[in-house]
Amino acid sequence: MAEAATPGTTATTSGAGAAAATAAAASPTPIPTVTAPSLGAGGGGGGSDGSGGGWTKQVTCRYFMHGVCKEGDNCRYSHDLSDSPYSVVCKYFQRGYCIYGDRCRYEHSKPLKQEEATATELTTKSSLAASSSLSSIVGPLVEMNTGEAESRNSNFATVGAGSEDWVNAIEFVPGQPYCGRTAPSCTEAPLQGSVTKEESEKEQTAVETKKQLCPYAAVGECRYGENCVYLHGDSCDMCGLQVLHPMDAAQRSQHIKSCIEAHEKDMELSFAVQRSKDMVCGICMEVVYEKANPSERRFGILSNCNHTYCLKCIRKWRSAKQFESKIIKSCPECRITSNFVIPSEYWVEEKEEKQKLILKYKEAMSNKACRYFDEGRGSCPFGGNCFYKHAYPDGRREEPQRQKVGTSSRYRAQRRNHFWELIEERENSNPFDNDEEEVVTFELGEMLLMLLAAGGDDELTDSEDEWDLFHDELEDFYDLDL
């Protein structure tokens, strides 16, 4: 029954509030329904009311349950969680890793076994109902042996989570069919067989790895030492590295051969440097290897002479225009004519080495485009005897021009008659009226006539030195720069 209002006061309790108070007085257990607080009450209830708390002390404070009640001891609701059937259990504590410990605002208690059994029973019933409904819809697709299922369940109960032999569970191997612990027909023989196979493969791989030379020991030192999985080879007497395979004779002989070749090249280079470091240029009188500019530390090797010149000085000497061709093409010391100058980083004096250098120089020149041929747009006066490359823009090489049958002899006869005319003109003219060009023309014709006479009527001479000299004279006469 609702409590009467005291005299002099106004009853402010609404109808819903009176009904809730009546239900609270009639029932020994309070209903967890919180009425709307009055305007004067705070979020957690305000101060104590005039009736000393009343039924509100039997209701647990929802803010205190979450640890955020700011009223403290003045709260009109109960702060006793032991009597509350609606306590919030910490889900992290149930999982076993709550980081707050005793300071956690939620209850740290494990669920009762009766509750676990009830939850398990409900889960089982729901799963059975779902499976029965599914089987009724889909139909009898798979027949199951009830006795076998029960035996498996009993075996599962025997070797469940509480069993002590759970550490002996069968290991899952990728690529192999997995056999569960509950299957009595599953044996460990296939697993052991697979493991044995894997171990044999690993052993075979280890053996193959042991046959390979260690790349670190081959170039220096291996930090693993004797524990290295690779093979450390024998030391080579030439290079001092552990690169000789103990069981591969072919590899040992091949490496020793390559080491000897590399050693010979190094020795040749050392000898070349030794004989070149003190050579003095015959024009500037400086040691070639001691020039201030490193790009000028190169020799200009004359093809027919063994005198020493730096490349810069001999090229400058041979490019002079105020002297005759024989003077600038000859050696400044011995006056022997050399057809061309070969640039070289080392001094070369022996005939065989000089021939190798000349062949190497001509091979290098054959890879450079001839500026007179100009990719087919111009004409080179030396034709197929030119040192430089005659190639078209698409990469095709110039094919040597073939002369028709009988034209070669007729052409040589015409040239011979032409030079005889030059000689006759030379003899009949006044020698004091001849200028330098006519003298050069006469010398050039006389030299070519000698070449034709030496070769006979059928063939020309194949002397490269004579033809090179002829090229130089022709170059100077026609003001060419080849």
From Swiss-Prot:
GO terms for cellular component: cytosol. Signal peptide: none annotated. Disulfide bonds: none annotated. Residues 40-52 have a biased composition (Gly residues). CDD domains: RING-HC_MKRN1_3. Its EC number is 2.3.2.27. Pathway: Protein modification; protein ubiquitination. GO terms for biological process: protein polyubiquitination; protein ubiquitination. GO terms for molecular function: RNA binding; ubiquitin protein ligase activity; zinc ion binding. A zinc finger (C3H1-type) spans 55-82, 84-111, 208-235, 364-393. Residues 26-52 are annotated as: Disordered. Auto-ubiquitinated; which leads to proteasomal degradation. SUPFAM superfamilies: CCCH zinc finger, RING/U-box. A zinc finger (RING-type) spans 281-335. InterPro entries: MKRN-like, MKRN1_C, Znf-CCCH_4, Znf_C3HC4_RING-type, Znf_CCCH, Znf_CCCH_sf, Znf_RING, Znf_RING/FYVE/PHD. Residues 26-38 have a biased composition (Low complexity). Induction: Frequently induced in esophageal squamous cell carcinoma (SCC) tissues. It catalyses: S-ubiquitinyl-[E2 ubiquitin-conjugating enzyme]-L-cysteine + [acceptor protein]-L-lysine = [E2 ubiquitin-conjugating enzyme]-L-cysteine + N(6)-ubiquitinyl-[acceptor protein]-L-lysine. Residues 236-263 are annotated as: Makorin-type Cys-His. Pfam families: MKRN1_C, zf-C3HC4, zf-CCCH_2, zf-CCCH_4. Keywords: Metal-binding, Repeat, Transferase, Ubl conjugation, Ubl conjugation pathway, Zinc, Zinc-finger. Ubiquitous. Interacts with p53/TP53 and CDKN1A. Interacts with TERT, modulating telomere length homeostasis. E3 ubiquitin ligase catalyzing the covalent attachment of ubiquitin moieties onto substrate proteins. These substrates include FILIP1, p53/TP53, CDKN1A and TERT. Keeps cells alive by suppressing p53/TP53 under normal conditions, but stimulates apoptosis by repressing CDKN1A under stress conditions. Acts as a negative regulator of telomerase. Has negative and positive effects on RNA polymerase II-dependent transcription. PANTHER family: E3 UBIQUITIN-PROTEIN LIGASE MAKORIN-1 (PTHR11224:SF37), MAKORIN-RELATED (PTHR11224). This is E3 ubiquitin-protein ligase makorin-1. It comes from Homo sapiens (Human).
